[in-house]
């Protein structure tokens, strides 16, 4: 593959937005991922790499039916996904994968007002 021939081909958000206490982070990952795949006309069988932070990328791949050759779980805060893009480009250019899904799923608004974990009140 020639350098510079990597492209972002699909992008999407989850179908529902806002306060979503009835949907898990994994479900939000999956919903956004399926919407992104639909945006570019591919399915889980076309993806051979996955990258995400916070949630386990292997669990997300399994949930979506993806069998990855490449997995990136780099988590460094809010810029994790920009690092995933750079890692994905390097993985594709080196032949480690052909199509890499970068996903995120979280509804921080759903946790507003909730008691933090480990706090007894």
What are these regions (language model features)?
Residues 77-87:
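Short phosphate-binding loop-to-helix
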